[in-house]
Amino acid sequence: GADTLDTHSSLNMPGFQSGLASTNQTFDISSGADSACMVLDDRSLWCWGYGADYALGQGNNESSSSTPIPVLRPAGWAEQTIAVSLGSYHNCELLAFGTVQCWGTQYAAGADGPLVSASFSYNSGTPTPVALDAAAVLVDSGYDHSCAILVNGSVQCWGGNLYGQLAVGYKCVTGTEGDCGVH
C-alpha cells in the first residue's frame, strides 16, 4: 500500500537534510521508543524525535525535534562516533577508540553502578563514559539495559536486571552491573 515500504522503496523524509551537509551519508542508525539517532560518515552523531528521558543528547528533558540535531559535545571534542544503539530510557554510542558513552534516565544508562564514571548523574542529558574493563568493539541497548563486547572477547552489561538480562543472577538489585563472562 501507499503507507508501506518494500525492499525496493526508499523512505522520503521532507526536511531530513535540514542542517546536514548534502555530502554526508548515514553510516549507522538506531531507533528507540520515541526517538532515533544516526551516525554520519563524518562520524558525527545526530538524533531526532521525542526528547523526554534526555533521549536527544541536548542536556535537557524537554527538547523534541522532527529533524536531526547534533548531540551536544564539550568544547574541543575530537573523538568520533562509530556506532549508536538506543534503548527505551537511554542511548549509547561507541567511539573510535572503544569508549562507550551513554545518556538518558535512570539506571539504564549506567547510573548508580561501578561501571559509571563519578561525573555521571542519575539523569544524564549528554553522553557520559561507561567504565568498562577494556575497550569495546560493539554496544547494544535493550529496554532498560545495555551490553558491550570488549576487545578481549568478554561481555559487560549494565542497567536493569529484573529478568536476569545482565546474566548475573535472577532479579538482582536494580543498578547492579556485572561481567557476563561470555568469551
Locate each region found by the language model.
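Short glycine-/Asp-/Thr-/Trp-enriched loop segments that recur within the blades
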Residues: 19-24, 75-79
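Short coil/turn segments that connect the beta-strands within blades of beta-propeller domains
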Residues: 33-34, 43, 88-89, 98, ...
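Short glycine/serine- and acidic-residue-enriched loop/turn motifs that recur at repeat junctions
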Residues: 1-16, 46-67, 101-127, 156-183
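Short loop/turn motifs that cap or connect beta-strands within the blades
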Residues: 13-17, 71-74, 131-132
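Beta-rich catalytic cores
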Residues: 25, 32-33, 64, 80, ...
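Conserved core positions of repeat-based scaffolds
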Residues: 35-38, 47, 90-93, 102, ...
